[in-house]
Amino acid sequence: MEWLKAFCSLIGRILLVLIFLNSGIGKIGNFDGTAQYMAKFGMSHTSFFLFGAIVFELVGSLSVILGYFTRFGALLILIFLIPTTLIFHTNFSDRIQMIMFMKNVSMFGGCLLLFATGAGQLSLDYFLRKKRG
């Protein structure tokens, strides 16, 4: 059953962060449009914050997928989710925004679990730790 736990941890990590990988890549492809969308919410210095969001999403998701510095990657996603959720998804009179808020809260929970437990056996973290000692 250890193999099942390891396999499920790997698949769970990938599925948890695919949305962030896709979103980060999408933001690169539509940088100006995304910056304009952010400005509609009263944000200033949108290019700076957008660049940060892209870095957090891409580095965090790749870290989690590879299982390399997994807890750090999960932390990057957690830090990204807090302002994103509070700035863009708190209009609860809009059902879609309420769903987006709850989706982000759920992903926050998944990242907290990953931060607490680590990546598991099918990860670079595990293999490097095992190799060292």
What do the predicted segments below correspond to?
Residues 1-29, 47-55, 59, 65-133:
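Extended, low-polarity transmembrane helix blocks
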Residues 29-44:
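Membrane-interface interhelical connector segments
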